[in-house]
Amino acid sequence: MHIGVAGNIGSGKTTLTRMLAEHYGWKPQFESVTYNPYLEDYYKDIPRWSYNLETYFLAQRFRDVLEISKSKETIIQDRTISEGVYIFVANNYEMGNLSDRDYQTYMQLFELMMSTVKQPDLLIYLKSGIEHLVANIQKRGREYEQSISIEYLDGLNRHYEQWISKYTGPLLIVETDNIDFKNNPEDFAAITDRIDAQLFGLF
């Protein structure tokens, strides 16, 4: 089984992925940012490095999806392959950070890849407001993220909402602005109760 956790930068995806993996005994698959050779340059000059960064991420996510499809374990994934395309690439293209030529080349690659993979058995979307995202980004203190603009985050949020509104697979939306699932066991239990109901038909 494949569980995907989706959400904007700073929404708590990695934290929730780790907690759910521990709770259910699932195997977590985290998106690696440590070894992306473009990430630091990207946040310094987004137009220059958008195509390089997004193509690198696409290759990594496709590799992850292929591994998940072959696994007999239940895997919970931090960020799905579709997010890279419908959120980050779409936002960069809209903002003029990707040329028409680069965008079309990227989409051709993505469409070829998607012909071989399927949607997660459940997608958990962490819906977060800008203030919540900014607070989390500042709190975790990653240097390369401190230059992210409000405009950029807002564009990502808008594309997330558009994508989720058209999503056709099994979906669970968690609004994160007024909960603290990391530190409040009741908030985390409320999420797992909803997952139990969706996956296992438990009340």
Positions of the model-derived regions?
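A basic- and aromatic-enriched beta-loop-alpha substructure that forms the phosphate/nucleotide-
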Residues: 61-101
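Conserved substrate/cofactor phosphate-moiety recognition/catalytic segment
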Residues: 22-60
